[in-house]
C-alpha cells in the first residue's frame, strides 16, 4: 500500500524530473517492505513499480543469486527465508530458521548462505538448494550485518549489542578474529579487492575500516553535516563501486548518502536523498527520501538506488552527478533494495 | 444512577480491552530520529486506564529509535498512547487506530506535546 504522503511527494517529483535526461536503464530492482509484508518489483526502464509480491511476515534482508534468478527474502516474523523465482514469483523453497534479519550468499556458486539470526545470537549456514542447515556459529548479542569476502574465504558478521565485527573462515566457520567497533554495528561491506572490510556503526556515527589480513583497524571515518545534530547521523548501508574508488554510506535520519573516497577514507560530499527539488507546477521545495538504510547500484554503476524507510520510497541517485534524479514510491517501510545483475 | 452504572461499564470495557489477551500481534515502530522510550502505555481512547508498560516487552526494556516493539494483551480498537522518554518527558498520541492496522508508528512529529 502506498501512503498518501508518498503519493503526494512522488508525483510532483516525477513531474519535476520528467524532462531530465537520463541514460537508458534496464533490469529490475526489488525493495523489501517491512511493514507491508511485500516486495516491490521496480522496472528500471520505466522507473516504477510493476508488481507487488506478497511475502511472509516482516521482510527485511535480501540477497540474489548471481544470475538474478532467485531472490532470497528474510522473513523475521515468519521465522524463515523464502526463495523466490524472479520470473514467476513462485516460492521455490523455504529455509526455516528463527528470526532471520540479514543473509549473504557465498560467491561463486550461490552457496552456502550465511544468516544472522538476530534473537538467537547465531550465524547459521545453509545450502539453498537442499534448504538443509550445514552448521551454526555462536556470535555476540544481536547479530546483524552479514558479508562474504569477494573470494568467498572470509565471512564477517556484526553484532549490534556487543559492538563487534566477527570474522569466520570458510569452510570451517572457525572464528578467526573479533574486532571492537563503535556502538550498534549494522552492516559490513568488503572492498572488491578483498583487502578491507568497512563496518558501519549506527549509534557511533562512524564507519570502521578493518584490514582483512591483520584484522587491525586501518581508520575510523567520521561524518559531519553542517546544520545537523551529530546524533542524526546514523550510518547503516554501505555500497562500494567495483573499482574501489567510491563508497556510498546511507546515513539514516540524516536523509543523506555520504560519498567517501575508498583509498583515502575521506568523505567527499553528501547527497541528500531528501534533496530539495524545484517543481515548476507547485512552486515550492519538496523533501523526499527519509531514513535511507540500504542502497544498491545498477549493474553499470551509473545509478544508485536507496530504500527510504520513512518516506516509503526509493531514491535514484545519478552517481556521476551525485544528485537525486528520481523517486519511486514503494510499500511501507522499505528496508533494503537490490538490483538484478542482468 | 443509570449513567454512573453505564460509565462504569464503559470504563470496565476499556480496562478489559487492554488487559485481555488476544491472538493478534500488534507492534509499535519507533521511527523517531534519536528518541528512546522507557515507557509505552496504551489506554482505550478517551480514558486514562493505562495498561502495563509495553516497553518492558523489549529485551533491553526500552524502545530504541529504529526499533520495533511487540505489544501484548491488546484487542482491536482505538487507543491513546502515553510515551515516556529517557529524560522522563511524557507525550500522548491520541486516537491510534488499531482496528484494522496491527501497528502504529511513533515519529518525531508525534512528540510535539511532550511535557
Residue spans of the language-model regions?
Chain A
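Short aromatic/hydrophobic-glycine micro-motifs
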Residues: 1-2, 33
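N-terminal export leaders
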Residues: 2-8
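Predominantly soluble domains enriched in secretory-pathway, periplasmic, or organellar proteins
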Residues: 8, 12-342
